[in-house]
UniProtKB/Swiss-Prot annotation:
UniProt protein name: Large ribosomal subunit protein eL15
NCBIfam families documented for this protein: PRK04243.1
A single BP term in Gene Ontology: cytoplasmic translation
Cellular component GO terms, alphabetical: cytosolic large ribosomal subunit
Source organism per UniProt: Aeropyrum pernix (strain ATCC 700893 / DSM 11879 / JCM 9820 / NBRC 100138 / K1)
Length: 225
């Protein structure tokens, strides 16, 4: 079976800074640095990722590219007396990811739209860029779309600020432990991990039966019987 176009796009984005795609990314970053921090783009940069997250080339759906500075928080240095250790200027990083920060900034820029999802598109030594998919809940094309009309209800307003997007749920720990405990997949993975650790233990029967190749060659002369 022939591979689709999206397969080849995804393959290039596995190593985006190598080969011909790396030269293209270099030219893109040079251009993106000169642009505003929040910019509406005509088409998504990663079409495969955008389509997987719900993007559709139709009225009522837009994509905004957001630039976020890398690193932790920059806090103002206090002018009152205290030790430099207790000034609280360095070493403070927000608990939320830069991707979630990009979604929040896009939501503030377009308050009448609903953030659907976002994805990574590039970075340099100072900034990271994300593209955020936004949907207009009042557009007739969105209201008539059975896959997107769930955003038309009022309860989805301000999703990034309430941790309801994919990046927000990851920040809340719903994808790691709290939201997965009790499911069959979580229990199966936990039991499989316990079995692997039990086999690797030095006192287990399976570990005693395993002989390294060099020991087998030295003492058994290559005889496996």
């Amino acid at each position: 079976m022939a591979l689709s176009m999206y397969h080849y796009i995804a393959r290039e984005w596995k190593k985006p800074y190598e080969g011909l795609h790396g030269e293209l990314m270099k030219a893109r970053l040079l251009e993106w640095r000169r642009q505003p921090s929040i910019l509406r783009v005509e088409k998504p940069t990663r079409l495969d990722r955008a389509r997987a997250l719900g993007y559709k080339a139709k009225q009522g759906v837009i994509v905004a590219r957001v630039r976020v500075r890398k690193g932790g928080r920059r806090k103002p240095r206090p002018n009152k007396g205290r030790r430099p250790k207790r000034m609280g200027v360095y070493g403070f990083a927000p608990a939320k990811s830069l991707r979630l920060i990009a979604e929040e900034r896009a939501q503030r820029k377009y308050p009448n739209l609903v953030v659907l999802n976002s994805y990574y598109v590039g970075e340099d030594g100072r900034y990271k860029w994300y593209e955020v998919i936004l949907v207009d809940p009042n557009h007739p094309a969105i209201k008539n779309d059975p896959e997107l009309n769930w955003v038309t209800t009022g309860k989805h307003k301000g999703r990034p600020f309430r941790g309801l997007t994919s990046a927000g749920k990851k920040m809340r720990g719903l994808r790691k432990s709290r939201g997965l405990k009790g499911t069959h997949k979580y229990k199966w993975k936990k039991k499989a991990k316990e079995r692997i650790l039990r086999k690797r233990h030095e006192a287990s029967r399976g570990a005693r039966l395993i002989e390294p190749d060099e020991i087998r060659e030295k003492f058994h002369k290559g005889d496996l019987t």
